[in-house]
């Protein structure tokens, strides 16, 4: 059993899915692609966690009777704190992805029944003691998960209450609606960071956050301010990070807000945006956790920098980036993560707020 919170820095309750992707002709379809929100968020945290720190990245993979051997080998190469659960009485969760209207929008449907993860999956595992959790769910489910995770921790260790983990909530797109607005405000009190994309943010308020050429910066700031005024976090000191694709992200906490650009400024560098947002959140979580500043905004800004880098690797190809090893250390898609991080920080020094 891992020590309480010492071994696992990050745990996602997003799912692992095997993807089948159908492109517009004449490009042939691809099958048995590693995917799912949980996988991409684990990737985001893993990119900033070379071994032995890689084992601090927690995620759960439910392996059905048809789970491909090569995917087991692939997952093992990441050397993470993954929990592989054998479920031989079912098929692995699989999804179909098809492009609608060119390359802009990817439609999705499940090909096999999904097996959703909840707090029970953490019981009796080191993942329960993670220092941060990524939740991708509805507002009401978010509240349930936070309450149940904290209850489980307290049941096993009475002093766990003093070591509250960071909860990062990614609202599930289908339920970012005005009907869920009040539930959303309730859920904000339970988590530390909320991170929707700008369309999902607008959905809760019934507002359009898309401008003609780029995201509507002022509308996004205004709606985010309303969340902050309502209160994010148990003590009202939480933050919002609104992801805006090619336009970067808005980071905001009480009394402070700041925009950050996306790493890739050219559309040519983006092969497939799928998983970019999830990867961002994995990088964000470990970036906030390992920042070590007493300033909430400084921690969130460090997290957003790391998240932007993680997302940049996720969207350069269909599926996962290629992990390689050299004398100098790990590379992803042939690039050293620290080199890309340094490059990004240099660019941020001259970035003009929109």
Predicted regions and their residues:
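Histidine-anchored nucleotide/phosphate-binding helix
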Residues: 36-48, 146-153
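Conserved N-terminal subdomain of the carbohydrate kinase-like
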Residues: 18-31, 47-136, 148-150, 158-164, ...
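Short beta-strand scaffold segments in enzyme catalytic cores
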Residues: 43, 95-99, 248-252
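Short glycine-enriched, charge-decorated loop/helix-capping segments at active-site entrances
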Residues: 26-33, 208-214
């Amino acid at each position: 059993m891992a020590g309480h919170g010492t071994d696992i820095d990050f745990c996602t309750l997003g799912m692992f899915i095997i993807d089948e992707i159908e492109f517009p002709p004449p490009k042939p379809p691809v099958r048995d692609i590693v995917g799912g929100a949980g996988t991409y968020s684990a990737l985001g945290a893993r990119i900033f966690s070379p071994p032995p720190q890689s084992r601090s990245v927690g995620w759960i993979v439910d392996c059905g009777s048809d789970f491909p051997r090569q995917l087991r080998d692939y997952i093992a190469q990441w050397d993470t704190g993954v929990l592989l659960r054998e479920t031989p009485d079912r098929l692995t969760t699989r999804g179909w992805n098809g492009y609608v209207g060119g390359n802009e929008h990817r439609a999705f449907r499940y090909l096999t029944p999904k097996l959703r993860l909840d707090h029970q999956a953490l019981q009796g595992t080191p993942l329960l003691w993670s220092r941060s959790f990524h939740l991708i769910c509805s507002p009401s489910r978010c509240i349930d998960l936070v309450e149940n995770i904290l209850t489980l921790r307290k049941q096993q260790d009475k002093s766990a209450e003093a070591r509250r983990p960071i909860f990062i909530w990614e609202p599930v797109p289908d339920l970012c609606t005005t009907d869920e607005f009040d539930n959303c405000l309730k859920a904000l009190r339970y988590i530390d960071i909320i991170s929707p994309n700008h369309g999902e943010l607008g959905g809760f308020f019934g507002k359009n956050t898309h401008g003609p050429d780029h995201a509507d910066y002022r509308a996004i700031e205004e709606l985010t301010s309303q969340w902050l005024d309502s209160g994010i976090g148990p003590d009202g000191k939480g933050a919002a990070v609104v992801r805006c694709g090619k336009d970067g992200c808005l980071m905001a906490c009480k009394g402070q807000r700041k925009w950050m650009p996306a790493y890739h400024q050219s559309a040519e560098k983006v092969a497939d945006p799928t998983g970019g947002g999830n990867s961002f959140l994995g990088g964000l979580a470990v970036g906030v956790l390992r920042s070590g500043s007493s300033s909430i905004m400084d921690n969130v800004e460090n997290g957003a920098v790391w998240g932007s880098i993680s997302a940049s690797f996720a969207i350069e190809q269909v599926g996962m980036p290629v992990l390689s090893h050299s004398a100098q250390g790990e590379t992803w898609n042939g690039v050293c993560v620290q080199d890309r991080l340094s490059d990004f920080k240099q660019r941020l020094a001259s970035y003009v707020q929109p």
